[in-house]
Amino acid sequence: MKKIVSILFISAVCIILFINLPWKQALVFEEGRTKQQVAYLPMADGDAFDIIFVHSIHLTDVTESYVVTGQQIEQKMIRFSQYGIGMPAEVHEGERYEYKDGMHHLYVNDVYFDSMNIRNGKTVSNHRLVVKRRGERERQLQFNDYFVPGDWYAVSIQKLSLWQLWRGVEMR
């Protein structure tokens, strides 16, 4: 009897450890104030994504492009059609500017984030996430399908355990 109890106990401990080990890398969205995981999107090193939002003043799309680099988010480019509040006004060392097809493109280098704060638009709520995973077709997800308009979220690259994957909402 003691042997069965010992085996069951060791098995339970192994299962608990297994489901709590960091396992899969993902782009994780946490509620800004509580840091509770709201949604995640599996992303590997080198996968890319764009965040597209409508500028609240001139009501045109702004695209920010990122690449997953290790446990960080690397910003690559900002694309917009009009200058305005919050838009880059000058090119800094290491950046490259290009005006193409009626759009301003600012290519940046060496801009890395451990995490970023993003507010889902409230007045003009049309934020989109364009997913560019290697070996898959590009797809676009609407923020409002996962997030409350007007709320803010901390976005980071994390290794999630099986437990976190099971209880979280995968963005599809």
Regions found by a protein language model. Give the residues of each.
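N-terminal hydrophobic targeting signals that begin at the initiator methionine
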Residues: 1-3
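Hydrophobic membrane-insertion alpha-helices, especially the h-region
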Residues: 5-22
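Alpha-helical transmembrane signal-anchor/signal-peptide segments
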Residues: 25-37
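Short, hydrophobic/aromatic-rich segments at coil-to-beta transitions
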Residues: 26, 45-51
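Active-site-adjacent structural patch at catalytic or cofactor/ligand-binding sites
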Residues: 39-42
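Extracytoplasmic/periplasmic/luminal assembly and interaction segments
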Residues: 50-90
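Mature, soluble, non-transmembrane domains
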Residues: 89-172
